[in-house]
């Protein structure tokens, strides 16, 4: 479908869509008010699981990627039950430590290739397949958004105590969102591995975490399409800017994150922000009031109408 694009452009587009999947993985937990910094760790789990199955066990590509996503989801479920009882900064630090444990473990095990990573991964995922997966995930998100699960997650985000008082099992839905986030991050890791053909622990760095977190904060937690479009827009803009240095990218995204948190803390898809912008655009312009054309009529008298 995208054969008219040159190989480099297809590779860049695939990387942007992988980032979109990672942003969606954060969008899931944002729905219930959870700030998870373990996304990169789950991405590494999915990438290494699928790559090892393909290179060592000779699994086909699609089952290997699916298995990697499932392993990441299982790990998210297990460890999510341990850290999701935390709140605020403690939850953020707990999930960050969890993600770093996964990455450091991968870097130090010999059967994962150690610091050198894994090479020789089959490169047989097309850009069209990745586009289809992102759209399919979006359709699922829309269905969940309209379901009771989506309403429960949003209720938890607004006020946990009120949600619990309404009969919503807060712990269960937070764990469900964390598990789904791990699945999407593992899926993104698998697709990236089969797009580049090589992976190493250095890919899952703090700089990448800052980039994905910045994209997620810019998009906000209200519209899944906003997450995808933000990832695409920033990715395309980055290509035009031509920034390739990791430190420069980290500074760029970090500064962007600070600006967004100050100006639009709820993201650009915040309904209140959109309503204000729409109201200002549609509100009619009122010029200076014109002086009355006739004197007020006496009490009880009808005004004079001139035709």
Each PLM stretch: what is its role?
Residues 1-307:
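Transmembrane alpha-helices and adjacent helix-loop boundaries
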């Amino acid at each position: 479908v995208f054969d008219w694009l040159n190989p480099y452009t297809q590779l860049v587009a695939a990387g942007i869509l992988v980032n979109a999947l990672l942003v969606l993985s954060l969008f899931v937990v944002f729905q219930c008010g959870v700030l998870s910094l373990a996304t990169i760790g789950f991405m590494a789990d999915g990438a290494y699981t699928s790559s090892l199955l393909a290179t060592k066990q000779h699994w086909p590509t699609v089952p290997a990627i699916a298995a990697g996503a499932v392993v990441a989801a299982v790990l998210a479920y297990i460890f999510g039950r341990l850290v999701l009882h935390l709140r605020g900064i403690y939850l953020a630090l707990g999930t960050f430590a969890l993600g770093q444990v996964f990455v450091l473990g991968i870097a130090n095990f010999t059967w994962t290739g150690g610091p050198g990573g894994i090479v020789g991964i089959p490169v047989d995922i097309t850009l069209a397949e990745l586009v289809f997966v992102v759209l399919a995930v979006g359709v699922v998100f829309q269905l969940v958004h309209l379901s009771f699960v989506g309403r429960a997650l949003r209720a938890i985000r607004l006020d946990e105590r009120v949600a619990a008082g309404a009969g919503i099992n807060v712990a269960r839905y937070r764990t469900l969102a964390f598990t789904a986030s791990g699945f999407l991050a593992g899926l993104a890791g698998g697709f990236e591995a089969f797009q580049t053909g090589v992976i190493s622990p250095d890919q899952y760095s703090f700089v990448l975490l800052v980039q994905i977190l910045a994209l997620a904060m810019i998009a906000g937690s209200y519209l899944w399409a906003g997450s995808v479009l933000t990832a695409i827009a920033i990715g395309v803009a980055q290509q035009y800017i031509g920034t390739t240095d990791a430190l420069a990218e980290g500074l760029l995204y970090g500064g962007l994150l600070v600006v967004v948190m100050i100006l639009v803390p709820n993201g650009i898809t915040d309904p209140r922000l959109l309503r204000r912008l729409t109201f200002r655009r549609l509100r009619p312009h009122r010029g200076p009031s014109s002086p009355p054309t006739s004197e007020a009529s006496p009490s009880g008298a009808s005004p004079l109408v001139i035709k």
